[in-house]
Amino acid sequence: MDQTDQTTHFGFRDVPLGEKQTLVNDVFHSVASRYDLMNDLMSGGLHRVWKDIMINTLNPPKSDAPFALLDVAGGTGDISFRAAKKAGAGFHATVCDINGDMLEVGRQRALKQYLDDRVSFVEGNAESLAFPDRSFDAYTIAFGIRNVPQIDLALAEAYRVLKHGGRFLCLEFSTVEVPGLDKLYDLFSFNVIPQLGRAVTGDAESYRYLVESIRQFPRPNAFAEMISAAGFSRVSWQTLSGGIVALHSGWRL
């Protein structure tokens, strides 16, 4: 069965598997220039806290020892910049994203922050990474894996490119656990976020998709099983902010 015969979800719509990546690309082409501003508005700045927790969990070495990070779906560079500022002189991050517009925003940000010698940008597909086996000490993906058409392939690639002892970290939206907060969160997500998107980027539909894609993503226990199935060991997760997001971890051992 080829991709024209298979379907997957794009938000709440079913689409041919081969079309999802193009549709996702269109979303991020549309919002790239205002993506970071919208993250602040949508989360009330909480995304900064969640990303700091991710980097503290990664804990890149502060020594001169070489440490190679692959930040997939890293687009505008937020995760890599945070890691570079925390790490020692031996650190280098490679941001890999399928969307050239997002990468260009990241390159400009790297120049402004004088991090262009420590963070590089490569256009590529999470399902088929153009890196040799066992190339990286860590693999991060923040708010990106739910947009990948075939998540199992992305996880297999993450495992392949990690060195023995390498760590996989994934920050992704999850299922709200606090009674009452779930209803408020839905109200904000489906009614406010698309209108914020319209006001800031001129595009409500892209943000409607992003909200819908959160609801379609597996619950933390189900996603943890997918991580384990890809070969990772010591798989765990922690929920943050009442379950709005989850930080998943696994090791190649």
Swiss-Prot record:
It is an enzyme of class 2 (transferase). The keyword S-adenosyl-L-methionine applies. It holds the Pfam family Ubie_methyltran. GO terms for molecular function: 2-methoxy-6-polyprenyl-1,4-benzoquinol methyltransferase activity; demethylmenaquinone methyltransferase activity. Keywords: Menaquinone biosynthesis, Methyltransferase, S-adenosyl-L-methionine, Transferase, Ubiquinone biosynthesis. It catalyses: a 2-demethylmenaquinol + S-adenosyl-L-methionine = a menaquinol + S-adenosyl-L-homocysteine + H(+); a 2-methoxy-6-(all-trans-polyprenyl)benzene-1,4-diol + S-adenosyl-L-methionine = a 5-methoxy-2-methyl-3-(all-trans-polyprenyl)benzene-1,4-diol + S-adenosyl-L-homocysteine + H(+). HAMAP family: MenG_UbiE_methyltr. NCBIfam families: MenG_MenH_UbiE, PRK00216.1-3. This is Ubiquinone/menaquinone biosynthesis C-methyltransferase UbiE. It comes from Bradyrhizobium sp. (strain ORS 278). The lineage of its organism: Bacteria, Pseudomonadati, Pseudomonadota, Alphaproteobacteria, Hyphomicrobiales.
